[in-house]
Structures are given as C-alpha cells and as structure tokens.
C-alpha cells in the first residue's frame, strides 16, 4: 500500500506499508518503506505510481511506525502495489533488529532525508546515518542547524 504523507513545508511524499509483523503478544508492528520523493501536489503521486512503480522497490530506510495518521485520514491511500523490494530482505535477522523491531519517528526522519529538517535534529547528529539502508548515504541537500 502506498500512502501520501503531508510534509511540514506543505509538500508531499509517499511511504509504503511493507509488512505487518507480530512484535509481541497482541502487539503488531507496521513496517514502512521511505523513498526519496518530494512533490508539490498530491495528484502527482498518482502519476508517479502509474508511470514509475519501480521507484517503490528501493526504500532508503525502513522502520516500524504506527498507522494513526492513516486511521485519521491524514495519510491518504494512493495505490496498492505488489512490491518486490530489491534492497531489503524482510527475513534477515540483523535487519529486523536494527530497522523494524523499533518504532521510530519516521516522518521527521523522512523530512531530514529530504532536506526539510536539519540532519542533526536529534540528540545523536548521526542518528539517521546509522539507519539508512545499504547503498544510501546522506544526500547533498542535507543541512545542519
């Protein structure tokens, strides 16, 4: 499932629901994929999904995150895709421990990657560096406060 995410600068991005994993008894963790997407108008997301669905095969980050904003309607479902992730093996135990057994503040991290928030917004200025997936690094647009 691809959903639109409003950003603090008035633009939009998209994230994908990759999986639902049992975290502990009665508690489930939604695994989300994050992408290098920033657009002005939500209608552009429809075109992006239709014309370049392969963009959703290589997230720069995955993490566990709640779905409250989806339930409240803040995030809109754009499409349902059968995604074959090319850079993530959801059965990899080390990825599970590092990336999706942990609930993270995903949208602020997305905004840091997109250059909307400062890269060093958290206490650990290298926090985001440590959780980017293999093959991804700090983008040139990153800035510091």
Task: Describe the residue ranges of each PLM region.
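Short beta-strand-centered aromatic/proline hotspots
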Residues: 11-21
């Amino acid at each position: 499932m691809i959903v639109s995410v409003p950003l603090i600068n008035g633009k939009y991005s998209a994230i994908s629901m990759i999986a639902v994993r049992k975290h502990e008894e009665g508690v489930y963790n939604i695994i989300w994929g994050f992408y290098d997407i920033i657009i002005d108008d939500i209608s552009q997301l429809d075109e992006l999904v239709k014309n370049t669905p392969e963009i959703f095969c290589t997230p720069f980050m995955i993490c566990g995150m709640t779905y409250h904003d989806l339930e409240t309607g803040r995030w809109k479902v754009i499409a349902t895709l059968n995604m074959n992730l090319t850079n993530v093996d959801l059965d990899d135990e080390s990825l599970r421990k590092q990336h999706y057994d942990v609930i993270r503040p995903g949208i602020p991290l997305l905004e840091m990657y997109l250059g909307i928030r400062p890269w060093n917004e958290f206490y650990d200025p290298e926090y985001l560096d440590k959780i980017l997936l293999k093959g991804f690094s700090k983008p040139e647009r990153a800035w510091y406060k």
